[in-house]
Amino acid sequence: MRQFLFLLLLAGGVFASEDNFTEDLIFGDTGSNAPKNEIARNTPVSYSPFEKDAYLTSSFGENRGTRYHAGIDYSTNMEEGWPILAPEDGRVKEIRTSPFGYGKVMLYQGKSGKTWVFAHQSSFGKLDIQVRKKQYATHKNDVKLTPNTPYAKGDTLTFSGSTGIGNPHLHLEVRLDKDRVVSPCVLGALCLDTIAPQIFAGAIWQGNSIAVTSAEAIEKGCMVTPVKNEFGLYLALKIADYSREPKDNPMAIRRLEVWRYDEKIYSKVVDTLRYSKMTDVRNELLWTEEADTAGDWHYIPAKIAPLSKYTIEVEDFAGNITKRVFTLHPKCNGNKPITQVKNQTAPVYTFLGKTMLNLFMCRSGYNFKVTGDKDEVLTDDLCSAMPQKITTLGRVLQDYPTAKYIEYTASASSTGDGKAVDEKIAVFRRTPYQTNVNWKADLGNGTTITQKITGIPVAKLDSTPIAMAVTRTHTDSLDFFEFHPKGLQLKKWNVCVENKNNMAALYWLGETSRDWFIFDKQTKGKNRCASANELRDVALILNEEPMSLGFPYWANSYIEGISQPVLKIPVVYKYDGIANGNAITAKAKNKWIAVEYDSEPRELVLEGTKVPDAGEEITIIIMDEAKHKNKFVITVPEI
């Protein structure tokens, strides 16, 4: 249900790069001299989707975890039913309905040859009649049509909504062909954005030594380096853009350029993307545990040298520019700590694509012991052997190359949640050139985890030990297993969790939603195995809470472009949701009724004219993602 050169970093591994790296797309190089305060790049507005202004809430190329955002999103002020106008003369190439992803989506083929995509619609206007006809002919809720209906520029095409994923908004996408998409802003689409991009932080590293600098210090012209007067440094910048106040929706940037004195050493302009290269997002935007907080960490694949002055220039899609000038120093005045984790309780996590170990927790009463591959104790007090601060796990393996486990313990008063902890982190030392891994780890309490990983990206420059880790984390509702470093786009990750005391199904954790999803394909029994193309947190979950339906109620929704009565029924579940719209069947007196499933906020929607009279019954059968069939009988309320 979810979906990179590959990710440039492992814990201590960096890919080779050119000294001068330029990746300019449509607009190309904006000049070889050091940046001025402004540049002339204001594409005249030639198309506004609505009959009124609307601000951006998501920009082109934004980080979507395992892919880039292929279009732009407009706010509709949490309202549905805004008429959307045709950008040019053309025909409706295709319309589709689905409870997920794009929801109700229209593909409009313009005379220019471009395909304009309008997603999350509430209504296709007059084309709703064709949709309804196909649904009732096939008894399927999710359908696809190719109407080929002509429209002229400025005609009302469709109506905004909230189908698929997200609150009410319009997703606009422009496809040049089957592989390439272009930013609508480049084509003259309205892109209202009144705030220049923000640089929240920077990071400089060499091998397993990392230094992070806050925005306050960077604004004063200083960036902290972890090593003094040494070459072979690497740089990442945490950046976000906002379109307006309040700053609710962090967005991506269009252009990022870096100069060393007056030499441009890096340039990235994002005006086009390729579907075939969408996973390159892991290449440019480094994975961190706080991946859903404001800003992305942009990796700069250019060698950073000491004793040099650097200029950074960042531009958004409306032409607003932010510039910073800095030099490298061992310390910076005004530097503040940077948040590296979110929703994280275990001492091991991923930051900038590296596996990190939080030895700062020693100060709270945690104890760490390192054991070797022959179960020998390498140190029973890592808190005394190493500085009590956050470090890369690779740095620990540098001192203890035969380490196999790091055991950590803490009393109930030390953990902060009133529960004592006694767990261990299984660690694996991988060479920078090792592309495949077979690794078996015993995490105690009868749990063994086996991983077979193929197609790991190869680090070409850095020979520092590369650290991988897995540990168990306890929460109030369940225990799950964390795998690090995240953000690796692999050929295949096969993971098996063996626990004779828990033979429940295997689930994976959504990166930003924090929801659990069952693996579609997995083995059964005490050894549960599943596959993915990147590391995920997983859990063995026995779902004993069946899906239920809330009280039905009448509301209004847009049908054929007009607000009309609909019956809405809340859907309640903890783990196993609805796989697709066709997993739902509704009947009244044995007569099939079309159902729309709104995945946010989890409601079934039935057209009012198709619902029987008040007091009569509707039978609804839902197949959930775990293949459980749920049957409900509801009574139609008074309108």
Predicted feature locations:
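Long, low-complexity serine/threonine/glycine- and acidic-rich segments characteristic of extracellular
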Residues: 152, 192, 207-333, 376, ...
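Surface-exposed loop/turn motifs at beta-strand-loop junctions within extracellular Ig-like
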Residues: 158, 176, 241, 314-318, ...
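Short, compositionally biased P/S/T/A/G/V-rich stretches that sit at domain boundaries
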Residues: 182-230, 240, 326-356, 541-562
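A short beta-turn/strand-edge loop motif at beta-sheet boundaries
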Residues: 227-229, 245-252, 356-369, 486-489, ...
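Short edge beta-strand/loop segments characteristic of extracellular beta-sandwich folds
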Residues: 236-242, 356-362, 494-498, 566-574
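Proteolytic processing hotspots in large secreted/extracellular or virion-associated proteins
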Residues: 430-441, 463-511, 554-556
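Proteolytic-maturation and junctional protease-sensitive modules
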Residues: 485-535, 580-592
